Design a protein with these regions (language model features):
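Transmembrane beta-barrel domains of outer membrane proteins
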Residues: 1-5, 157-163, 173, 202-204, ...
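Periplasmic-side early beta-strands and strand-to-turn transitions of outer-membrane beta-barrels
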Residues: 1-192
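Transmembrane beta-barrel strands of outer-membrane/channel proteins
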Residues: 2-8, 172-178, 210-214, 331-337, ...
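Conserved C-terminal beta-signal and adjacent last beta-strands/turns
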Residues: 3-9, 151, 197-199, 204, ...
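Extracellular/periplasm-exposed beta-strand and loop segments of Gram-negative cell-envelope proteins
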Residues: 15-20, 133-150, 190, 223-229, ...
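Transmembrane beta-barrel architecture of outer membranes
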Residues: 153-159, 169, 188, 194-198, ...
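Face-selective signature of the C-terminal outer-membrane beta-barrel domain
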Residues: 200-388
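Surface-exposed extracellular loop regions of Gram-negative outer-membrane beta-barrel proteins
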Residues: 218-225, 386, 391, 405-441
Length: 441
């Protein structure tokens, strides 16, 4: 038996661009007012790449380090003299004849030391308080610019069955599929070229069954939209260049009389010069970033994990002649092996694949009374995961038949589930610099 299925559709593209604050409101932040123009630190809900942020004061701090280095070299390595000279240069921007405007201060700094002239906007801006409370984010991209919304799904199924005898049948089944879609989980993901296959071999008879199956995943060319956009911005223009460019332009425009918002918009235009626009997701540059694993400085997540399962059960009623006592005895067991393989992009498996073994066994004894009016069952199972202590879970139930197709069921049971593979081993970097960590790494 063979079956095929193909589906194609237009996926939804997220278009909520509300400004989002990660530091106010609820524990996870909240949507706030403001656009890119009104908030230099704008972080759009479905805008990708604008999660990179910095305060202008921190940009000044890094520049200050460079200035001190140049002065120290000029004073033959004398750090004390360099600090004193820096204090004089900085003080000239605070008050005095050279603090009138940026042009005057730049000329003063150039006269003091020509090598320091490029640093004038940063010292002047800090001295005049232009950086206080100003945080700035990189310019991001809309989801429609980076994600292909065409969803595809192709499936093939097939099976072969062989009758060994009147009571026993063997079968081999295969299921495989591939496709593209857009997925929202801990972040927004473009799932492209995803592959999933399962192969099952089973032999079953009247009173017993044994089967084994293997599931294989392949994430294809899937990528994290947020991380990819941030790295794309860094590749086009590193933040170590973008922020100093923005800061210098911002001070220039503020000194020229522009208000805070207009100066910020103008400075962004200067810093964004040469920035690709439009459908960047189709560009070779973006694809190169999306093709590099997250663990190596790109946006691609890899998942070639596998699951192997062997399970069996046996109805021992006939073997032990329990039918004459109106009783049934069923036993079974299962063995699982997880092989996690994401090369450090999803799980904490940078050093190599992570294996997890899990097994379990169960038994159930049932007995019927009063011409099947009452059925009492006792069952229990024991499960063990190599990362956790074993657990025994019992169950007792009674079913009373009060009329045809009418029953009363009374039961007591316990249940337990081991943490999932992600609960145990996830190590995923998501938007805003947040990292999801499992309980075991």
């Amino acid at each position: 038996k063979i079956g095929f299925q193909y589906m194609e559709a237009q996926d939804w593209l997220a278009n909520n661009t509300q400004n989002y604050s990660r530091t106010t409101g609820t524990q996870n932040g909240e949507a706030i007012g403001g656009t890119r123009y009104h908030d230099p630190n704008y972080d759009g809900v479905n805008i990708y790449g604008d999660e990179t942020t910095s305060s202008l004061s921190s940009i000044y701090s890094s520049v200050r380090t460079g200035v001190l280095g140049a002065l120290t070299a000029a004073y033959g390595g004398n750090a004390t003299a360099a600090n004193a000279a820096y204090g004089q240069l900085y003080g000239a921007a605070v008050a005095g004849p050279y603090s009138v405007n940026l042009t005057t201060y730049s000329a003063f700094l150039r006269g003091a030391n020509a090598a320091l002239a490029p640093y004038a906007p940063y010292l002047f801006g800090e001295a005049r308080g232009l950086f206080t409370g100003v945080n700035v984010s990189r310019t991001g991209y809309a989801e429609s610019d980076i994600i292909n919304p065409v969803a595809k799904n192709f499936k093939v199924t097939g099976s072969i069955h062989y009758k060994i005898d009147d009571k026993t049948e063997a079968s081999f089944s295969a299921y495989t599929g591939s496709g593209n879609t857009v997925y929202t989980g801990s972040d927004r993901y473009s799932i492209y070229g995803l592959g999933l296959s399962q192969f099952k071999l089973e032999v079953k008879s009247k009173n017993w069954m044994i089967r084994g199956y293997k599931t294989l995943e392949n994430s294809g060319e899937s990528f994290n939209a947020t991380i990819t956009a941030r790295y794309f911005n860094e590749l086009v223009k590193p933040s170590t260049t973008w922020y100093p460019t923005y800061t210098a332009a911002f001070v220039t425009y503020r000194d020229a009389g522009m208000n805070l918002l207009d100066a910020g918009a103008a400075a962004r235009a200067v810093a964004d010069a040469g920035r690709p626009t439009g459908r960047i997701g189709e560009s070779d540059l973006f694809k190169s970033v999306a093709g590099i694993p997250i663990s190596k400085g790109g946006g691609r997540f890899l998942d070639k994990s596998q699951l192997t399962v062997v399970e069996a059960n046996y109805n021992l009623t006939e073997l032990f002649g329990l039918e004459k006592y109106n009783a049934d005895l069923l036993v079974g067991g299962i063995i699982k092996n997880y092989s996690l393989n994401s090369q450090g992009t999803l799980f904490a498996d940078t050093a190599g694949k992570i294996g997890i073994n899990e097994s379990g066994a169960y038994a159930q004894l049932s007995k019927r009374y009063f011409d099947d009016i009452l059925k009492v069952s006792f069952s229990g199972r024991y499960d063990k995961n190599e990362n956790f202590a074993g657990r025994f879970t019992p169950r007792v139930s009674a079913v009373i038949k009060v009329a045809e197709d009418n029953n009363i069921r009374i039961s007591y049971q316990q249940a337990y589930r081991f943490p999932t593979t992600q609960n145990q081993w996830i190590n995923l970097l998501v938007g805003g610099g947040t990292r999801l960590m499992g309980g075991l790494p």
